Each structure stands twice: as C-alpha cells, then as structure tokens.
Amino acid sequence: MELDAPVLGAGLLSADRLEQANINPSTGLATDYLNHFNEVVMLLEMLPAMPDCAADVLDWEPLDYEAHFEGSNFSDKKLAVLAYHAAPVKLRTHLEKHVSQINEAVHSAQELIRNTPDISIVAQQIADVATNEIKPLISSASGVIHGHVRPDAIQLEGEDAQAEIDALFA
C-alpha cells in the first residue's frame, strides 16, 4: 500500500497546525531558518567594535533547511521539515537560490578575514557587506517564506504552474 505524500493544508499540515508552529501555512516554510543567517550577520556587523568576533564568524558554517531544523531547538522541527518537503518545489528552489547567495557572501567575508593579517583593516568593509548585501538577501528569503514572490520570479512550468501560483498567493 502506497502512502500519499503530505499536502499543505491537510492532516498534519493543516493551516491551523502550521500557524501554531510558526510555519507559513501557504508556503510551508518557517522563518526560524533565517535565524542561522541573522546570527552570522550580527557577528559580521560587530567586527569593527569587537574584532574578537572574527573567530565566531570563521566557525560559522552553511546549513540547508533540513539540517538547520534537525540541529535546532525549534519545538516543531519535525513538522517544519515535513512542511518543507510539502512546499511547492519551485518555491523551495527560489528560497535555496537566495540561501546560496547568502552563503557565498558569508564565505567571501570569511576568506577576507582568513587572508588579512589584521582584522581591523577589513572589519568595516565586512560589516558594510553584511548590512548592504547580506541583510537584503535575508529579507528576500523572508519574502519567499512569507509568499511575497513575484510569480515571474519562480518561473513555473507545466500544467500545474497556475495551480501552484494560485496556492502560493491564496
């Protein structure tokens, strides 16, 4: 007997249940994932005043959505992962594109820290990148999580495309 894949809005993934868990019921995504990135941005922005934060920045590693929740204290982490897998593929792909850009920007900052003999030389530059480049990417990722995505940005294809767009903006 084959089990049906979980569907947003039904059963364990009912809108009420997702809302109670702080998971967007329309997208199946949770903003808690962004805490991982907000943490490193905070450290990057503190570098000019607290150069000792450089070690913590270098210790930061990218985590995908599922790995973040598996290692988090989020009370409904299993539900968050289940909802993520039920989220529209094109929406997840759009989120992952933003996450990849965030990870690349943080990696560049980490490389700059590793390759400078004195962190104070690059601390302000790195803090500016965090504020002016990484934070806007996190805001864009938040928009995806909340379903605030231009339909043309996710480039849906096939006969289910309109249904996915309609569900996203319902």
Language-model features: locations:
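Short acidic DE-rich linear segments
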Residues: 3, 155-170
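Short, low-complexity N-terminal regulatory "tails/caps" that precede and couple sensory modules
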Residues: 1-9
